[in-house]
Amino acid sequence: MDATLDRFFPLFESESNEDFWRIEEIRRYHESLMVELDRIYRIAEAARKKGLDPELSVEIPIAKNMAERVEKLMNLQGLAKRIMELEEGGLSRELICFKVADEIVEGKFGEMPKEEAIDKAVRTAVAIMTEGVVAAPIEGIARVRIDRENFLRVYYAGPIRSAGGTAQVISVLVADYVRRKAEIGRYVPTEEEILRYCEEIPLYKKVANLQYLPSDEEIRLIVSNCPICIDGEPTESAEVSGYRNLPRVETNRVRGGMALVIAEGIALKAPKLKKMVDEVGIEGWEWLDALIKGGGDSGSEEEKAVIKPKDKYLSDIVAGRPVLSHPSRKGGFRLRYGRARNSGFATVGVNPATMYLLEFVAVGTQLKVERPGKAGGVVPVSTIEGPTVRLKNGDVVKINTLSEAKALKGEVAAILDLGEILINYGDFLENNHPLIPASYTYEWWIQEAEKAGLRGDYRKISEEEALKLCDEFHVPLHPDYTYLWHDISVEDYRYLRNFVSDNGKIEGKHGKSVLLLPYDSRVKEILEALLLEHKVRESFIVIETWRAFIRCLGLDEKLSKVSEVSGKDVLEIVNGISGIKVRPKALSRIGARMGRPEKAKERKMSPPPHILFPVGMAGGNTRDIKNAINYTKSYNAKKGEIEVEIAIRKCPQCGKETFWLKCDVCGELTEQLYYCPSCRMKNTSSVCESCGRECEGYMKRKVDLRELYEEAIANLGEYDSFDTIKGVKGMTSKTKIPERLEKGILRVKHGVFVFKDGTARFDATDLPITHFKPAEIGVSVEKLRELGYERDYKGAELKNENQIVELKPQDVILPKSGAEYLLRVANFIDDLLVKFYKMEPFYNAKSVEDLIGHLVIGLAPHTSAGVLGRIIGFSDVLAGYAHPYFHAAKRRNCDGDEDCFMLLLDGLLNFSRKFLPDKRGGQMDAPLVLTAIVDPREVDKEVHNMDIVERYPLEFYEATMRFASPKEMEDYVEKVKDRLKDESRFCGLFFTHDTENIAAGVKESAYKSLKTMQDKVYRQMELARMIVAVDEHDVAERVINVHFLPDIIGNLRAFSRQEFRCTRCNTKYRRIPLVGKCLKCGNKLTLTVHSSSIMKYLELSKFLCENFNVSSYTKQRLMLLEQEIKSMFENGTEKQVSISDFV
């Protein structure tokens, strides 16, 4: 075994331990990953040594842990070893940041100037806090500078957002710590500078977004007391209107990075910052106490056990994405606590039947939710309750299976209740949201039954048996027969009781009996509110399960009243009058609306290229290389000769100038040349020897593209049968080194597209899964055994495809569409190896099944560290299932975000830093380092709060009834963080709810299948009318005010201020040139904003106003806007008249 794996298993468990087999499986699994990674790395290194890429070696270094990732990211030799020593010494992550920063400034990692050392120290601290995964340390901190007035400035940039609030504040704290060590003074702002901050931060909130906007008093308190000058690069085009041109502020534009650090960092994370200050013992931060007291606790209202409806999730409503439930409204989703094997980690579980009826909610669709967090990805959970509906014939039916939903969908008239929504305790803990009353479900009831001495499976019992258990064992009424008594008023209860007693009758036939009630509209409404299933036949309401119902009404089997009604609310009355315990069925409803639709699609740039090779304007609007090879600039010009900005390299052997790493003539490695635009001279230094200006590694020069293309086709042995090969208009990298044309030709052949870094990627919505069935993912038991899965999650030998198996942390289940794309990529890689690198093929894949067992890289857009994964199967959903640890290693949760997969060999062969854009944020979304082994201790801490138990204890459910803090229950519910001290952190996780199939429900949301906005809005409003928990008039009002009106007004403003664009070269003009055409290419100009973009939502807005109860104010706004649009675009009716008409 690789010695580096010893760190993950410091203790060898004895074979007597019942989990020994699990840990052994994980050991072998990690070893197999490392062996395969090493094999593929060697192949890639051999290919790279041929000199056909921008570098001679693979450009994705391997890191086996957080310490190695940080070292490779910061390029400090010996840093990884030191971090591991400090970790083994028991230091917290925060203290390690300060210790390492201290040692960097002291020169223990190499002597460097004071300013550079402080810069490295601050960046390294952020890298340690973010596990070396995100790009924030290199992209989010632009620079650190010692001001001439002897104080420290830290310039933040937009990508600092990806670090999160805690890492942002630690950068400020570490900067202060090393400032003191370096004997640099503190920052003392002027009154004008303080007021500049007070204006600029709210302005950033307007033009961008902030989670939290501090008050002017809080901003003043932070800025006037912070010993570091929190500065930033200008990130927005907006400028401040006051306090401009200040001597010590370098820009009038908004500095996004600064705003983020002060608002989402110091202001929002003040309590955490105070804790770190106390732990490290830094003086001068006593003012944090005033900030914490002044800022208050954003959750303080909810801590008072008064949980009010929250409509924040409705504030940014989008047309075509339906509201499923208004805040905490009857008929909305009923909260059920638990974690299914495919849920948790910011997801919400929904019954597949609910998904099918709603149409807009598919597997992976994002729901914006009322609580506990902001959003969650949808997963199917068949073991929770589905919706209750009213059919067109009046029947009320509970639909719990997908087959029932499919059979009844056309008959549904109204959705009375959306069913249950499964949210795990860990999400409440992560969001620090008070626990709200749990629905009365089987997992709660069975624990009360066991407490009373009952044993056995009572999941499905008859009504008679349920009542017998209540009478004999004094257990509460079974959840199946507990109705929503708390949802009706005392008056409704009295009316219902009297009506049933006076007018009802019990009729029996063939051993079955029913309760018949004469049809009464008020009784019908009350029964629907109770969610009591019944049928409407002729003029009668027929109730088949009636015994528990009449018992709760205080009636005997002859429908005679047993006793009188007394009590403050219906539930109290029911408990008193029935003689049995009846729990509240569903006190907590969760409001929700559709967020982003699910996604599983290949990554394409806009427009999508096949190769990173510049063609300038020669390729036309499509950047087509086939057009460019036939391009002639003038009558006498050479065909296929284009002029582009491209790298300058020179062969030291034969002197030929080229842009490749290896000379095409003599095979020698070329040297980089630099060009000075001022002196127009080439030299070997990056600084001009004449004028001292920084030179560029590229210049604009002629390239014989036709010759290069013909050579590439001949080299590959391909026929020139390609219609289109799309390149790029120009390279955005520092030296503008292009890809070899052979790669683009082969990508076109296999239908593969290239991303900015040279890789081919597939994007998919993130979904979690800890356990799977072989049948669900299309893999045989034999293949799974080959991959190291020998037992199911309970320890039994793996024999059939329906056993439940625990997923290994780095195994992924790809969407089928993703597997098909990666199959094309695999074939492209094999062709590349054989025809371009002259090596043996690697994948030899004929079908998607051949990809099982192969390694991939997972990467999130805001990070710079890929995570090694292994394909073990495929699911017919538009999302990617993977272990929560895998997602957390990418610093993601599963609330609806999407990440990408790429084949490992594609990344190792084709990725190059030389292709990355030379701009702020250019190194984000690039695998600058690869995490080989995922250690749960070193992933995003959110997953540490995920619960891993088989059931929540009775104490938990009782605690929810008193709105307990989730922290009170930490000792009662085992979580991932309780396992971090030993090997059991990798395996042996459990779940509370099973599901029939992880792909059940809807595959594609109606939002994606409906093509026009008109169809989407019509269906959205149709659904709003159908769902009892939705106020369709409020939805119409919000859609107009939040989406349509701002869009129309914005486009109307943009139309009057628009630029004009050349249809050929894309050059934009603020005013039309006097010649009336493009000054560069002579082509015609067109508008950039068209009248159709202004008018597109006008008719839809009028439809909503006419058909729904929209406020008069909104109607008048729309009417005035329509008049303004007509005055701009519609001419009055013209009529030819003669002078005699005026006589």
Curated annotation (Swiss-Prot):
EC number: 2.7.7.7, 3.1.11.1
Record keywords: DNA replication, DNA-binding, DNA-directed DNA polymerase, Exonuclease, Hydrolase, Multifunctional enzyme, Nuclease, Nucleotidyltransferase, Transferase
A GO molecular-function annotation: single-stranded DNA 3'-5' DNA exonuclease activity
Protein name listed in UniProt: DNA polymerase II large subunit
One of the GO biological process terms: DNA-templated DNA replication
HAMAP family membership: DNApol_II_L_arch
Function: Possesses two activities: a DNA synthesis (polymerase) and an exonucleolytic activity that degrades single-stranded DNA in the 3'- to 5'-direction. Has a template-primer preference which is characteristic of a replicative DNA polymerase.
Record's subunit section: Heterodimer of a large subunit and a small subunit.
Organism annotation: Archaeoglobus fulgidus (strain ATCC 49558 / DSM 4304 / JCM 9628 / NBRC 100126 / VC-16)
UniProt similarity note: Belongs to the archaeal DNA polymerase II family.
Gene name as annotated: polC
PANTHER family in the cross-refs: DNA POLYMERASE II LARGE SUBUNIT (PTHR42210:SF1)
InterPro entries in UniProt: PolC_DP2, PolC_DP2_cat_dom, PolC_DP2_central_dom, PolC_DP2_N
Residues in coiled coil: none
Catalytic activity: DNA(n) + a 2'-deoxyribonucleoside 5'-triphosphate = DNA(n+1) + diphosphate; Exonucleolytic cleavage in the 3'- to 5'-direction to yield nucleoside 5'-phosphates
